[in-house]
Amino acid sequence: MGKDTIANIITYIRNADMNKKGMVQLPFTNITEKIVKILLREGFVENIRKHRENNKYFLVLTLRYRRNRKESSKNFLNLKRISTPGLRIYYNYQQIPRILGGMGIVILSTSRGIMTDREARLEKIGGEVLCYIW
């Protein structure tokens, strides 16, 4: 049984969000860094910083919460892993689904790198569907 780094990222973020923790520490990989930068650009994450501890690198994320007068509510509604190591899911640019009518995002791994569904449609390229976030 191998490692699924993308599922681990999703699980770390989902668990921290459910426990209302403001910060998450993820192991650093190139894929992790690219996915987290997409989350920052789309507004799901407030801040990212690279942290070194015992010759190992980590990404420290600050999650974004909406501020209410009574209590702060979470911003992440749902994260779902689609393509797994045992079952890869590929779409061309016309088949890429729109999540909640465009309010959510699909993260794809394409021949030009990891990108969102909007970027893939603009460049007219498809790829492996990594996860849905809405």
From Swiss-Prot:
The keyword Ribosomal protein applies. Gene3D superfamilies: 3.30.1370.30, 3.30.1490.10. It is found in: Plastid, Chloroplast. One of its GO terms (biological process) is translation. Its main location: plastid. GO terms for cellular component: chloroplast; ribonucleoprotein complex; ribosome. Belongs to the universal ribosomal protein uS8 family. One of the primary rRNA binding proteins, it binds directly to 16S rRNA central domain where it helps coordinate assembly of the platform of the 30S subunit. This is Small ribosomal subunit protein uS8c. It comes from Phaseolus angularis. The lineage of its organism: Eukaryota, Viridiplantae, Streptophyta, Embryophyta, Tracheophyta.
